[in-house]
């Protein structure tokens, strides 16, 4: 018998085990909020302090609830604010306990309609944050009040003495943390005489009734500012659940802006970071001035005066060598590194946020075509690319290590491997650097060459044609094997960074559909909207299929789901992309506990559950998903062109979007599809419009000059045509297609070619590709044979003495130091003791085999099923194999004799980075030369 060690972690004997379903359904839930126009409605809702309103760009916010109870927050001061109705008989009623309350969240505003028929109460209330000062304002309209009643407003300290994450949802340790403190008396009570219209202002810890005219003025100004912000992006579609998104995006994005940079989060994690994807928000929502401010401030955070003076590897011994040592002059902390805080190039962080920052900067140039800013940023771009190369491609094979360069990095370590997502980032950066260099008169050759070599290496080393997807990574250590079960970030970064051919991109989305766990979204509600959800086959996804669970490695995270949906749109898999997008919106914004929330983690994440609100990373991705994915707006102003490739579902008859940069609309009437476009890009002269061809023939009615027209030979799911239109800023252009041939139908088409995973259909003069991949539910399983386990005849068992091969105690595994072999380069890797990951490099676990030892009698351990093994009560009791030098790579054990079965007691140690890779293999060598 031979035991071979394949993986780079540890294996010691082995055992059979099954994994629990980390994505098991949580408790049933239903829609908590319903779309009404641009707002979210709740009826006698139960959520408290879950919808934050933001005003100016400080940390001040007003927490609102499904009923009229509130809290305010700044780092220095937190207050609970309640309203009461005092009846003539002395009874006091809390506003949030009155009989009927319909609440609306319109981005930036919370409105309440409070009714109690038995008491004759009819009150309307609106709450907002002010935009010019750290204040809040309420308007109360008393349509009907009980005789002799009046209102009071009570300000109290909050229950929590300390807030762990600024009072964010799902992460605080104190129950009811924003409720009024039970330990302290109210700080103030303001009695308010009943009037038709009342205005109340919160300022500096206290509330006061405002004079009517002053209140009207402040309220009107605040509401005007709120509406202006919410209406910066407006979308109209046939789907009412999507028509709220414009204001949701702009209000959330405004909440993560601090007038210097885009923040990590609006509530929890309200800190400055150069990553992650929050920085996309500015350009995709029309704030190009804010975007430039963000990029300029972090450009000043790049190290430019510290040359590398230490060579690879530079691992931090104090942190068990799991990550880079924070030392100036090391490969990582030297010229080109972007520090954590804006305008400060003197502080170290433990992430490579360069890649994401640079990608956002390049998108900014795509949106603006600002060559002056490109010249200003050129030296920083050069330093960045040189820094990436010397740190993460030191062997110059044009494939890059990934060193904590994406949001999901906390549980990831690639040990200097060749990684798809980081390599894709570097491909796009080099490709665009070459384009920019040509435009500003710099040398493009080194960047064009590197981009070309990267693409060659990706296609030859990382693309797996048999699987239709890229490898997660190729191992640089051990047996240099390939991880062939990639996470979603591998797929969406590859597609987003343009390393994919159209066929590769589409097939990669099919990999996600068929291999990544899908979590159904179901509702226990009884409304028609709840029924729509249950009939719609909606589902969200986890970020990988890796086990065991570890934070960031296999979460149900909104940004990961949304970026995957964006990749589906980009790949032409539009129907699936839309379904995934809407699933995410239903999950977080309507079924979640905060209306219109762009959160971090989903309710369906079994480890964390729903948490965080208006988190920067998903805010940026959601902005791209709506603008670039659903509406297909993709400017390349550096080359004076704009592409529009709508991602609308096939059954939509209309849609339009308005942003500061563009208005365009789609309208279908009968056989006619009409598109109207008016953009405001100063550096764009042409629009390339890619649209479905629903008929084999059509008449074209154009309201502009058509520069080019062709059929798209790389269409998926249905044929498309491409128009190139002359369209300068401010000029309205239109195209109308009126079908006069046969309607496109898969049933009428014939297969004319088959490629791996795809088939080309043709109907008359139109052709398009469809997937031939089968998901697991469609596979023919009739030939599969169920596994069997024979009863064990205990009397026939013969324990084999292999004690001379034992080379360790089971308990030694995480007490050792696995020092060699280790990567010759600075990297993220498994800690020196073989447990945990770089974020928690000192975590460990005590392996206790005392129970096993205690159960041994006369050197025999008997399992509950009667199988017996020889095992000592003391001393070494296991055969360890490992690719680390601590133990041999393999163990050859002579068994002798003959038998029909062999039973082994086995144990193993692994980690998510080795999931779906064979960690070890046991072979039986027979005297006739055969191997089993």
Where are these regions (language model features)?
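Active-site core of glycosidic bond-cleaving carbohydrate-active enzymes
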Residues: 271-303, 379-382, 386, 413, ...
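Acidic/His metal-coordination segments adjacent to aromatic residues that form catalytic metal sites
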Residues: 257, 327-347, 402-419, 477, ...
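Non-catalytic C-terminal accessory modules of carbohydrate-active enzymes
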Residues: 74-81, 86-128, 132-133, 563-758, ...
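Acidic, contiguous internal or C-terminal segments within carbohydrate-active enzymes
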Residues: 116-159, 662-683, 885-903, 911-913
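An extended acidic
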Residues: 26-114, 208-233, 387, 629-639, ...
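Bacterial Sec-dependent N-terminal signal peptides
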Residues: 1-25, 140
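N-terminal/edge-of-domain interface segments
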Residues: 772-932
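Acidic/polar, glycine-enriched structural segments that form the non-catalytic walls/loops
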Residues: 23-32, 119-124, 128-137, 141-271, ...
